[in-house]
């Protein structure tokens, strides 16, 4: 079902930093092993300071991902604490609403934490969202594989475009 994933940094620009380069490479490799094509949006990997100081570019990345007909899923890089700064740029001249209305196919938006605000605004505009994994925290897991619970639901989502039932994990992981 999901063939192409757009990777966006709507809050923190962590994935553009050298100290997570190894993790990012693991995550990109994993997405390809799932059979996915990955489009890294233009500003997603510009680093913490750039992303922090350019909310308009973050908003443009989201709108571009929505408008890109090859993209099936928009995956948030990580949470953060200032996604709210995108709002003026997303709702200026109804750009976000128009992008969603013009999109010829349904897409999935996936992320958590600071991304909660994005889920609400996208849901209100009729865009499908799943409060779930982020790229850095979940896909880039620095072990041989993703955590089994995380992987199960991620695979279900990319294979079917939906998750039937989320069952709580019987295992709790703190630090591995």
Feature annotation, model-predicted:
Residues 34, 125-126:
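Short, structured coil segments at secondary-structure junctions
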Residues 11-15, 78-83, 110-117:
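Gly/Ser/Thr-rich loops at beta-strand to alpha-helix junctions
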Residues 1-70:
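ATP/NTP phosphate-donor binding region
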Residues 128-176:
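Conserved anion/nucleotide-ligand pocket segment
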Residues 17, 83-86, 119-121, 141:
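Short glycine-/acidic-enriched loop or helix-start segments at secondary-structure transitions
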Residues 43-104:
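N-terminal small/polar loop signature for handling phosphorylated ligands or for N-terminal nucleophile
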Residues 90-121, 128-135:
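Short, acidic/small-residue loops that bind anionic groups at enzyme active sites
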């Amino acid at each position: 079902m999901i063939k192409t994933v757009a990777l966006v940094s709507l809050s923190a620009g962590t994935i553009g930093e050298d100290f997570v380069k190894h993790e990012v490479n693991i995550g990109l490799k994993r997405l390809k092993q799932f059979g996915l094509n990955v489009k890294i949006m233009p500003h997603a990997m510009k680093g913490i300071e750039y992303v922090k100081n350019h909310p308009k570019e973050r908003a443009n990345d989201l709108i571009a991902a929505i408008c890109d007909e090859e993209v099936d899923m928009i995956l948030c890089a990580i949470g953060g604490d200032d996604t709210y700064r995108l709002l003026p740029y997303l709702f200026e001249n109804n750009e976000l609403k128009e992008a969603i209305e013009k999109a010829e196919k349904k897409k999935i938006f996936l992320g958590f934490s600071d991304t909660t605000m994005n889920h609400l605004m996208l849901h209100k505009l009729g865009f499908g969202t799943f409060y779930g994994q982020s790229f850095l925290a979940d896909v880039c897991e620095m072990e041989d594989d993703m955590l089994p619970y995380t992987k199960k639901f991620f695979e279900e989502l990319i294979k079917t475009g939906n998750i039937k039932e989320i069952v709580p994990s019987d295992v709790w992981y703190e630090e591995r």
